[in-house]
Regions:
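Polar/charged low-complexity regulatory segments
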Residues: 1-191
Length: 191
């Protein structure tokens, strides 16, 4: 039976969930990234329709905007791409694109934002993959059927160097399925 989690606020609940996911993913985000991830999750749970938008068009549209409007749109694109790649990878499949597509677009949005206003957006671009890994682990905390499938995990690891995806490939291939175990064990994890 699943245990009932009681936290005093929604922020504390998200914080606890992110911490549990970090432990499950064997990733430790710094306090700034952890806080940003919690706030992003809170923001998008209040407006779930935002994740279903066409991010590529928004990304292109941001080039036509200036100032605060452009900054907000780039941040939203980066945040949405993070959530889709981490929490809703099946959406990528439905749209007939790889998870790596959203990773690259999200990192680009954060990097452009960093280039324009600096701040910590460069850190978000650089640490996009570990944050995505934490979100993947969050999906799997209470439901192991939420794993991304083996081929998607392999592709994600190849494209991004995701350590969580690599672990999924190792776990999924331990029975000799599809991918030679000795090849995976010798994989370069320095992506």
């Amino acid at each position: 039976m699943t245990s009932l989690v009681l936290e005093p606020t929604s922020t504390a609940l998200w914080q606890a969930l992110v911490s549990d996911a970090e432990a499950a993913a064997n990733r430790q985000l710094d306090e700034t990234l952890e806080s940003y991830l919690v706030l992003t999750l809170m923001r998008f749970t209040q407006r779930p329709e935002l994740v279903s938008s066409v991010m590529a068009l928004e990304f292109l549209d941001s080039a036509q905007k200036a100032g605060q409007q452009q900054h907000a749109q780039l941040r939203d694109v980066g945040d949405k791409c993070l959530l889709v790649s981490g929490l809703f990878p099946q959406n990528a499949k439905r749209r007939l694109v790889s998870i790596g597509y959203f990773v690259n677009m999200g990192r680009s949005a954060y990097q452009q934002l960093h280039d324009k206003i600096h701040g910590f957006y460069g850190q978000l671009a650089a640490d996009f993959i570990p944050m995505m890994d934490v979100l993947h682990a969050m999906r799997e905390l209470n439901d192991q059927s939420q794993h991304i499938d083996l081929l998607d995990a392999f592709e994600l690891w190849e494209e991004t160097g995701s350590q969580h995806a690599l672990e999924r490939v190792k776990d999924g291939s331990s029975g000799g399925h599809m991918i030679k175990r000795d090849w995976i064990d010798g994989a370069d994890t320095s992506h």
